[in-house]
Amino acid sequence: MKKTLSVAISATLPVMAGYLILGFGFGIIMKANGFSTALAAAMSIFIYAGSMQYVAIGLMTGGASLVTTALTTLTVNIRHLFYGVSMLDKYKNAGSAKPYLIFALTDETYSLVCGELPHIPQEEKPRYQLLVSVLNHIYWITGSVVGAVAGGILQCNSKGIDIALTALFLTVFSDQWLTN
């Protein structure tokens, strides 16, 4: 367990750096648009879809209809359907953690758990997948809450913060591409 945790922490460090920054940006933008720290935290805990959370700010401030919100959510997150299908075999031994693993399958988490894991014994792979998922989720929540708190204290221009999400995905994808 200790070695698996160590490997999971090491694997998620680049995601941690990105999620703390991106979550911080999300929290700042939420506060800049008049939303509470509690709502920023709740969205990060229960929605946990970075790009959709950024889009949701515009939908909420623009008074989007339920149909528009549903269609936008489907469009932005359709890739998760393909992620989920491709992970069915990998998550077959996940037991009671399976629903959470499916929920927590972000772009970055997918890139860390979908590849070969030769340094993880077979019986530890479900634990590794869960640890990566939980750690990444914690990083995102932490960044969002700290950003919202900071956004309530500091007055800053939030223009351009949203592009950071795309940059993180490209960085993680490139690293995985070059490594595998």
Over which residues does each language-model region extend?
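Alpha-helical transmembrane segments and their membrane-interface exit regions
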Residues: 48-52, 75-82, 167-174
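Hydrophobic alpha-helical segments embedded in the membrane of multi-pass proteins
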Residues: 21, 142-145, 160-173
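Helix-loop-helix junctions within the multi-pass membrane cores of secondary transporters/permeases
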Residues: 70-162
